Amino acid sequence: MNMPFLPGEKKLLAFSVLLIFFSATAKYTFGQTLSINDSGYFEKPGVNILVFNSQYNGMFFDEKTAGIEIIHHGDRTATGGAVRLQNTPEQWDLIPKLVSRKVDKAANTIEVAIKYEEFDFTSRAVVSAKENGIEITVWLDKPLPQKLESKAGFNMEFLPSAYFEKTWLVDDKPGSFPLYPSSNTRIESSDKKISQFAGHNTFDDRGRGEFIIPGPLATGRVIALAPEDPEQFIRVQSTDADIMLFDGRNLGQNGWFILRSLLPSNKTGKVLTWFIEANAIPGWKRKPVIEFSQAGYNPSQEKTAVIELDKNDAPLKSASVFRVMADGKTVERWKGEVKDWGRWLRYNYAKFDFSSIKEPGLYYIQYGDQKTNTFPIDTAVYSDIWHPTLDVWFPVQMDHMEVNEAYRVWHGAPFLDDALQAPVNSVHFDGYSMGPSTQTKYKSLERIPGLDVGGWFDAGDFDIQTASHCTALLSLVDASEKFKISRDETFVDYPTRYVDIHRPDGKSDILQQIQHGTLNVVAQVKFIGHPVRGIVVPNLHQYHHLGDASDETDNLPYDPNLKPFEKTSHSSGRMDDRWAFTGRTTFLDYFTTAALAAASR
């Protein structure tokens, strides 16, 4: 039954509908036009777009920190905007060299030229502020080289963790970002693959001469990423090419989600246009970040917190320190002045001194509506924070040993097939290389005996770096001598190559670690004649290994007389044994001498 409106009810209803509409859409607006700031990138509140402010480097290649990038509501969620040669480039795929970069603030345009020297292929990208986003146009002065047809395309990569459990619309067709990679792939012959750095290969094809090509999750002309999330909503559209959405994690766990359009063959001039809009929440400012010692403070030391602020934010006049009591209540113990420090790079900074608090207890800092986690103030605050480093971290890094902790085996005994002489005139990865001489009595790929003992893994990798060993040995000796450390929480048994964490064995752990690091360095000097740059796996598909260190090689010494992947009880035809890069330097000789002299004490 229809009920008549009372006087004024229609106006009230209309107002209510408008209020609901504007409340629902207040966080969804592509907002004002981007403009180039004094730092040379596009900016508006909530959105920064960088155009090759950072370049690809020749050490670790694609580190996801170069090309056209988007910092979206304080988080860098897009990177790698550039012409690339693969659907989902891996870290060691070829990277372009920046030839030129021109910033025209008056025209609100940034132009870059990049070149793949391996193919004598140069492209230009012109990035211009347009309406509420940016327009990217790709220009070619010469047609694509034939080898790059159906391979060269414009890519932009998006951080997976920012889009997990979110959705997309591709030409209005819905989909969702997968938590685990699950898109289609296909196999192609290796002769169709563009070579990676120095001819190395990230893919272990088991001798089949093939490689993987990921297929797209979706394809269309207009792609909306996370349209339901005002902080992550980005829309990308093209009028002259399809845009494909890929999952880079099919090839590497460090892969990102990728948008990509192929460049056309036999065409010059403007060959591709993208228009990108990143949603900007009106009035958005990055929340203050309070930086302090999470380990805590000694009562007598200076205590200063650093407060990092949005460039459009100004420091509050004061901050407070609250003490957490045993009954769960909190009491304000100090309210002090916040002093403006100034601007550095992207942020404003302020300092908050609370050195006057000397009473032991648990505290937190309150700045506006931001609150830190709890930290202690106590005379013994630093007395045991080093225990996890000696108890767990160092044992886990122990090479050539099985390492156990309670129910967990961190890794089996690895690299029992160490090591082969690195071949001359070889360019390796991770900075390793060999010149025209081995500077040893060993020939290229000849076995060097006695190196399967002692040492630690390098940070993040499973290679041995001798200079890092020397630094660690000197630090451990210094700590042992100054602080008389006798802590014993690690069981080490060399006859069985076994380490057990949290299990005392009656010996000083720090002395055991000094011994373990020294063993490998001494073996180098004994069997090679001098300390070496390092010992590392020969294949790139081994180097990015993320599993148990003992699975990076087969632990069987390489025998060139066996067929590839053929094994006996004591040898293998698989060329996976680590290589010793034996170039000699005066610096490393003296550094090692100092470390061994210290360890001998």
Task: Describe these PLM feature segments.
Residues G207-W284:
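Beta-strand-rich recognition/accessory modules
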Residues F30-V83, S183-I213:
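Beta-strand-rich N-terminal accessory domains
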Residues R84-P143:
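Extended, loop-rich substrate-binding clefts of extracytoplasmic carbohydrate-active enzymes
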Residues E135-P181, K371-V381:
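Acidic (Asp/Glu-rich), glycine- and aromatic
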Residues A162-V170, G283-E302, T372-H411:
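Low-complexity, Pro/Ser/Thr- and charge-rich linker/hinge segments at domain boundaries
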Residues V289-S318, F322-A326, V331-A380:
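Ligand-binding face of N-terminal immunoglobulin V-set domains in extracellular IgSF glycoproteins
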Residues V453-A459, A523, H530-R601:
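Active-site lining segments of carbohydrate-active enzymes
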Residues A305, Y367, L473-R503, N520-F527, ...:
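Well-ordered alpha-helical scaffold segments within catalytic/enzyme domains
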